Amino acid sequence: MKCCRIMFVLLGLWFVFGLSVPGGRTEAASLRANDAPIVLLHGFTGWGREEMFGFKYWGGVRGDIEQWLNDNGYRTYTLAVGPLSSNWDRACEAYAQLVGGTVDYGAAHAAKHGHARFGRTYPGLLPELKRGGRIHIIAHSQGGQTARMLVSLLENGSQEEREYAKAHNVSLSPLFEGGHHFVLSVTTIATPHDGTTLVNMVDFTDRFFDLQKAVLEAAAVASNVPYTSQVYDFKLDQWGLRRQPGESFDHYFERLKRSPVWTSTDTARYDLSVSGAEKLNQWVQASPNTYYLSFSTERTYRGALTGNHYPELGMNAFSAVVCAPFLGSYRNPTLGIDDRWLENDGIVNTVSMNGPKRGSSDRIVPYDGTLKKGVWNDMGTYNVDHLEIIGVDPNPSFDIRAFYLRLAEQLASLRP
């Protein structure tokens, strides 16, 4: 019964945050400008291919996007990083999953935030990246923030980690050394580059009910229930949210309540807030070596009398009833949240999607038929909600298969 309640809370939160082309090859591989593999990177509360009873985050009720792309000659892989974790932690996990090895969150970072330095060990989806090669990252929602941070760490490393390693005579992950240029392109889909005001709704809810703590406690309990991780893996090992061998439940729960995670800014919730996103934007900048593409989504209309935005018919029910009305009416002059922030896709404000602006010096340019490096190529806005763009929520008028195959074809045409 407890497992059922946990999964109900989880699925509800996933809806809050985010949450035809015939078969055969779309073009001859010999005509492509690059053969870099595609890597799919999920958003907040996302999951891997082996979780959720095989229900795919990338494809959902519409099918399997990874399989579609592979069947059409585009080598594609799916990452599975922490669904509730910060972008820093997720970027470190993505790196280890790509090249292989043990996740290293950084000695300085771990000491600062009070969690373990090392995480799980992975064989590596593309270990050859250590010797060269490039990849394309297609990221949904928070995954776009994570991808941007990964590129920044790969190329620039972390000065703080380098100085800490030298001062304390500890090892340094290659990720923090910098000088790695293996991401050819980053495509963000419905990403809250400037945050989402939905976090403000959660903050308001916390006045009456500590939602974040409830979720993390549920995650901790679920992580200790047999077989639960096979259905949904919270991947919060770095926070010690796993019961130790021989540890009584009472002792475990007391230790859980004392965890620094409850007040930490090293979480997805902070990174997805407007202030958290702005802080990230101040140091994570577009690389001149990488192409950046941004796709925006919206599923609301503007009310003539109020000026607020309301959900269109067809938006998934949870977002339409719970989230979109708040997003479509929330204004906060102190934060600079005005009428431009009201249009949304049920989870994220559309104005936040075409690239980082608050605290950022990145340039955003409309796509004119030629993709450019080092700037954000704004690919336009699609009339789909946050879940329809990845197939989790069906939309018969949106050809999701054609969308991703066309995108893969564009990425294959990029000159390294």
UniProtKB/Swiss-Prot annotation:
Q: Which GO MF term does the entry hold, naming one?
A: metal ion binding
Q: How does activity depend on pH?
A: Optimum pH is 8.0. Is stable in a broad pH range of 7-10.
Superkingdom of the organism of origin? Bacteria
Which Pfam families does this one have? Lip_C (PF24708)
Does the UniProt entry include the keyword Metal-binding? yes
Activity regulation, in the record's words, is: Activity is inhibited by zinc and iron ions, and activated in vitro in 25% v/v DMSO and acetone.
Q: Give the annotated active site.
A: 141 (nucleophile), 345 (charge relay system), 386 (charge relay system)
Question: Do the record's keywords include Hydrolase?
Answer: yes
Remaining remarks? Is stable in polar organic solvents such as DMSO, DMF, acetone, methanol, ethanol, heptanol and octanol, which could make it as a potential biocatalyst for the use in industrial biodiesel production.
Cited function = Triacylglycerol hydrolase that shows hydrolysis preference towards some of the natural oils such as olive, sunflower and corn oils.
Instruction: Specify the protein name.
Output: Lipase
